[in-house]
Amino acid sequence: EVKDTSYVPIASKPYKTANGKKIDLNKVANSENFPPLSQWSLSKSFPKQASVSKALKNIKSPIWLNDLRNYHNRGNSTFQGESIQLGDFFGLDDVMTESPIVTAGFIKVFSDWITNTGIDGFRIDTARHVNEGFWREFLPAMRKVAKEQGKSYFPMWGEVYDAEPMSTAYWVRQAEYTEVLDFAFQSRVVSFINQRKAELLGELFNDDDLYISDKTNADNLGTFLGNHDMGRIGAFISPISVGPDDLKKDQLAHAILLSLRGVPSVYYGDEFGLTGGEDKEARQDLFPTKVSKWQTQHRIGSDPIGTASSFDIKNPLMDTIKSLNELRVKTPALTRGAQRTFFAKDGVLAIGRYDLETNSRYLMAFNSNSGTKNISFNLDLADAQWQNKSGSATISQKQNLVTIDIPAYSWGIFEMKTDLVKNKSSSAAAKIVLDEPKLNIDRRDQFILSAQVTNVDFAAVDFQIKDGENWRSVGVDKGATFSTDATSNNRYRVFPFLTDVNWNLSPTYRVVATLYDNSTITSQSVSLDKLKP
């Protein structure tokens, strides 16, 4: 307990040993140089004098949580600067995750959950409020334990509450998270549904390239429409009352969620059309409730629940979500396929998905307008045949031009029925065109490699660097960019870090592209010397 909970910056009061020696937390964090607990004094080492009553002195388990020297003791976070990781979270005492004792303790706690319960993954709260060094030890340890339990893939979605892909990509590539929650996806889908901002979704999927490395990509980002903190998709669509088109809008949002890249999650109760608000207002009971405002709260797709159980009520949203989920589960192109944008304008989004292993290809289009929209764009394959698998949109193709008619607040998901490999073999040969490598002006510690693969809509493009004896991959991009600017459209890209390259060995790069028939084409190699720091 501390009376004054205001945050005290390190610059004002640095950590010190019991003998008064300053401790640079950044230098010793999660390392063998971290001062042992015996060198920390509760009265001399911390800016705040924490205390606990005698009755509660040993109440926590594991026992290391009872030692107040295992906490940051700096006061409440201001959610700015260093306090993001060192401050207490709205009064919740912030453990010192830089300490080997704390790191080992949490590894033990979470490992026990895996070994004792057999769980298949974690959703980890407040990930960005913990220092990166902790995650670099903790996350590999969890994967090791899971693998020992026979789990070859053990997802751990970190909650990085930030809607900017550059921020979330940082935690994927530099903090050992291979999965984070995709808050950027959530915000762009809401903007598309409510404000017809298709361009934002097009830009979002271009930014998937930021996640790519030799070990990571955007495939397993956790996608969602709302949650227990921000509120439900129903609340974003119908904050006050239900409009005549709100059911269609809600169904459209779920069609986007369940057909595009990422690992989707449906927030409980959305299938019953719940609305509400933020935080506790988004945590309604589905069983009969005595909370009067929940009894009378408007719902999308059905009437207010009254004293009935949600499980006894029919709602069209449940049927929509169920059918879309069934389609996704049985369709590899939707669960794991590459993705690229073909159209993103005026409240209409058109996306292609492709699975190399099964050579299956899908097109989908979404319309957030109050009237029917007609769009057209070109594909690499002429006169393909398509079959509608979901939604009320219709499609036709003449030569290379695809035309899709999409009713208001609706969608269409179409499967290509043409033999892709057979028909593509008669088309113009694919070629690789490399762009000049350049520094990333948004992050000076990165550079950009980009290339076009002409005459094909989809390719798995492996960017390789040679800064020694052998070529090595720095990432595979499977979805070309979309832009109305020809200089940035149809690009495959990766964003390596400057520190990833041995600049003393005259590094070069090349591209190896895998095509529909699993054949490959390779570019010439290009020097990277001009980027040498």
Regions found by a protein language model. Give the residues of each.
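Solvent-exposed loop/turn segments flanking beta-strands in beta-repeat/beta-sandwich domains
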Residues: 454-469
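Carbohydrate-interacting/catalytic domains
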Residues: 172, 259-266, 272-448, 454-457, ...
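Extracellular interdomain linker/stem segments of modular secreted and single-pass surface proteins
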Residues: 529-533
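Active-site clefts of carbohydrate-active enzymes
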Residues: 217-243
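Short loop/turn motifs at secondary-structure junctions
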Residues: 117-118, 224, 262, 457
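Hydrophobic/tyrosine-rich beta-strand signature of extracellular beta-sandwich/beta-rich modules
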Residues: 511-513
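Active-site-proximal helices and loops of the catalytic beta/alpha 8
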Residues: 3-44, 48, 108-217, 221, ...
